[in-house]
């Protein structure tokens, strides 16, 4: 183990000087520095740059408070390694793989793997196209998710990205019994805490590993915690041959953390102040999230859109890697439609007749056509009123409004707030319900009966209660 000494500390960035004869640590190696003489308080640093003349520049994974010049730094000779395998299920830990759930720490002999790896080679990849049923109508009908694909949940602050992720974890654990890895990147600690207790109560936690690097942590932890979660998911895929779900909330914070340390590392800022290495960092993470011949990793990533601006470099860079996008729209939350998924802006590579089938494709495209025509007619309605529309257009508007409300539904994870039981709707039921609305079977039922319900049978029951 070669050792050096701290030369300077600038926030989360620490420069370490090694003696001229010593071998310099490699890029991404983990270094350890002890803050106290008892060697109880250690800080892990990760090598980011080699500056020459025995000097390396590192990023701290924990707060650098208490570090002083001259403290000894030890090179571990390898990258940060984290626990993997069945032992991680039901547990919560940080970027370094240390448990933070107040239960027993991992045993010393637990399997560990480095967080930095190469992406699978071209011949290892799987190319099958299979739909992952989520039980959420608007997603399954208009922007279905591919098993082993990458999904982006786009939206500004407070439009429901985290709630949608929680519902997906709930539905997939209950209906498919799959393993999930939840990675909290730079989000609210309170939300992580709520999610942990909800999962514990519902029993879902036994099939989930949780990794957190939250808002209050240094940028080094927020930058690397996504790789920690991904390493655990890769183990289940490659060694145990499992189909894994990887949730990342929020991928924007991964970019933001990189931006925070970029200038301190001596890099020139790029567009909008982001790091010049933005596309490379995103690519290195995203290329590892894929399906191989052994198993699949389906990733669902919440992506915060700063000031609702989709041209911002951070969300725009993430767009390039996705198979499906679920766009959350603030206007829909104002109308009380939840989940607030924009049916026209959301898209999926899987929405093709070869993958979803002819009937599903025909119903989905007709739903989009009706909603698009309704959007075009809204200006006329706002200025001249409904009376100026033809009978055919009035019928279309009525159906479009019913479709818009029927795209909403109650969530299981929101039951404690709404007081209404959540619903899981199979794809076949979803397609049938929308097909019947398009055929005009329910033109006589009130629009309100379609709001926040599950399958079409719920609409009929609700209408009967309303006296229709």
Curated annotation (Swiss-Prot):
The EC code for this enzyme is 7.1.2.2
Q: Name the predominant localization.
A: membrane
- Keywords, in A-Z order: ATP synthesis, ATP-binding, Cell membrane, CF(1), Hydrogen ion transport, Ion transport, Membrane, Nucleotide-binding, Translocase, Transport
Q: Which reaction does it catalyse?
A: ATP + H2O + 4 H(+)(in) = ADP + phosphate + 5 H(+)(out)
Q: GO cellular component annotations, sorted alphabetically?
A: plasma membrane; proton-transporting ATP synthase complex
| Family indicated by similarity | Belongs to the ATPase alpha/beta chains family.
Q: Which residues bind ATP?
A: 155-162
Q: What CDD domains does the annotation carry?
A: ATP-synt_F1_beta_C, ATP-synt_F1_beta_N, F1-ATPase_beta_CD
Biological function = Produces ATP from ADP in the presence of a proton gradient across the membrane. The catalytic sites are hosted primarily by the beta subunits.
Q: What is the annotated quaternary arrangement, including any partners? A: F-type ATPases have 2 components, CF(1) - the catalytic core - and CF(0) - the membrane proton channel. CF(1) has five subunits: alpha(3), beta(3), gamma(1), delta(1), epsilon(1). CF(0) has three main subunits: a(1), b(2) and c(9-12). The alpha and beta chains form an alternating ring which encloses part of the gamma chain. CF(1) is attached to CF(0) by a central stalk formed by the gamma and epsilon chains, while a peripheral stalk is formed by the delta and b chains.
Q: Where in the cell is it found?
A: Cell membrane
List the protein's name.
ATP synthase subunit beta
Give the InterPro entries listed for this entry: AAA+_ATPase, ATP-synt_VA_C, ATP_synth_F1_bsu, ATPase_a/bsu_AS, ATPase_alpha/beta_chains, ATPase_F1/V1/A1_a/bsu_N, ATPase_F1/V1/A1_a/bsu_N_sf, ATPase_F1/V1/A1_a/bsu_nucl-bd
Output the Gene Ontology terms for molecular function.
ATP binding; ATP hydrolysis activity; proton-transporting ATP synthase activity, rotational mechanism
Give the encoding gene's name: atpD
Membrane topology reported for the UniProt record: Peripheral membrane protein
> What NCBIfam families does the database record attribute to this sequence?
atpD (TIGR01039)
